[in-house]
Design a protein with these regions (language model features):
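Hydrophobic-ligand binding "helix-grip"
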Residues: 46, 51-53, 58-106
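Solvent-exposed, acidic/flexible segments
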Residues: 10, 14, 20, 63-64, ...
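Beta-strand/loop substructures that line and gate deep hydrophobic ligand-binding cavities in soluble
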Residues: 82-139, 145-147
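Short, highly charged C-terminal tails/helix-capping segments
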Residues: 42-43, 146-170
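Sec-exported extracytoplasmic/periplasmic mature domains
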Residues: 22-29, 72-78, 143-154
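Hydrophobic ligand-binding cavity/cleft-lining segments
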Residues: 1-46
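Extracytoplasmic/secreted envelope proteins and their assembly/folding machinery
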Residues: 14, 18-27, 67, 96, ...
């Protein structure tokens, strides 16, 4: 059995961060694994951001075949997922993402995986440093999430340009 988690602090409000991560389709923008196969085929069932939504994929040897399902949402706080891998190995893991306010405009996001390795992969556990391997991949995704959300936050802070009133222009 293993538990792996990583976190990052994002300069954005908690509700905005959660509203982004609860939609699994947004993982296309920040998940390490999505970047491993740009040609990956994706299918979706249900309403994204709601319990029961399933995102499935068929990818290359790096990402394999599987699906993830939203199995729980504590609105604004926690997203629970079940990952079901089909290829190259059949296994099921749980994952979650949480958001915690650090301050009014800062949010700590934690992304964690819990799993169990079955034979023959469990034989490799003493050799494979799952925490480092999977943890580095989680951290890469979180770092990209931070960049995306801070960019969105910055763009929203920009004051809209004031339209020129044509009645006051000199012709």
């Amino acid at each position: 059995d293993y538990h792996i988690e990583r976190n990052v602090t994002i300069d954005a409000q908690k509700d905005k961060v959660f509203d982004y991560i609860k939609y699994l389709k947004n993982q296309d923008n920040y998940s390490f694994w999505n970047k491993q196969d740009p040609e990956m085929t994706k299918n979706y069932t249900g309403n994204d951001g709601e319990v029961g939504f399933v995102s499935s994929w068929v990818g290359n040897d790096k990402v394999g075949t599987g699906e993830q399902e939203i199995i729980g949402i504590k609105e604004g706080d926690r997203l629970d997922l079940e990952l079901r891998f089909k290829k190259p190995y059949k296994m099921s893991n749980s994952a979650y993402m949480t958001t915690d306010a650090v301050s009014e405009n800062q949010t700590k996001v934690t992304w964690a995986f819990d799993g169990k390795m079955n034979y023959p992969m469990n034989v490799m556990m003493p050799i494979i440093n799952m925490d480092k391997m999977l943890g580095d991949q989680l951290q890469a995704g979180l770092n990209d999430l931070k960049i995306i959300l801070e960019k969105i936050q910055t763009e929203k802070r920009v004051e809209p340009s004031v339209p020129v009133d044509s009645a006051n222009t000199i012709n």
